[in-house]
From Swiss-Prot:
Name of the coding gene: TMEM234
Entry's family note: Belongs to the TMEM234 family.
Protein name: Transmembrane protein 234
Transmembrane annotation, as ranges: 1-21, 82-102, 111-131
Species per Swiss-Prot/TrEMBL record: Bos taurus
Transport found in the keyword field: no
Compartments where found: Membrane
Length: 140
């Protein structure tokens, strides 16, 4: 089953939402204070309260969950052999890009080479799957 351009764009958006929010979630959760309660249930409730009342954590978490919802909806009409590589591989790329923008060390030239190779592989995957016109698969 070939994918439409809209499906591919939806999967790229999923990757952007997943990957782009990971460094923000990491940053927000590292700044939280540690909570200590006597029972595991109270500990869990206190940790959830601390997380979900923190807008710095809640905004990227909400965007990340929107990505999951979009992924679920897109899977209804997209081939898994296309959906999984696009969303998961590109999510890593978006994580590295956003991490770099936020000042994290992403690994230098080898990380950049890995990103280029990943994008090249995903491009080949998309090119072989997207239909340019109705009923005609694209030529590679």
């Amino acid at each position: 089953m070939a994918a439409t351009l809209g499906q591919v764009l939806a999967l790229v958006l999923v990757a952007a939402l997943w990957g782009g929010t990971q460094p923000l979630l990491k940053r927000a959760s590292s700044r939280l204070q540690q909570v200590h309660e006597r029972t595991w249930a109270r500990q869990l409730l206190q940790e959830m309260k601390t997380l979900f009342l923190n807008p710095e954590y809640l905004m990227p978490f909400s965007l990340n969950q929107c990505g999951s919802l979009l992924y679920y909806l897109t899977l209804a009409s997209t081939d898994l052999t296309l959906a999984v590589p696009i969303s998961n591989s590109l999510a890593i790329i978006f994580t590295l890009i956003v991490g770099k923008v936020l000042g994290e060390d992403i690994g230098g030239k080898r990380a950049f080479a890995g990103m280029v190779l990943t994008v090249a592989g995903i491009t080949l995957c998309i090119t072989s799957s997207v239909t340019k016109t109705q009923g005609q698969p694209s030529a590679l």
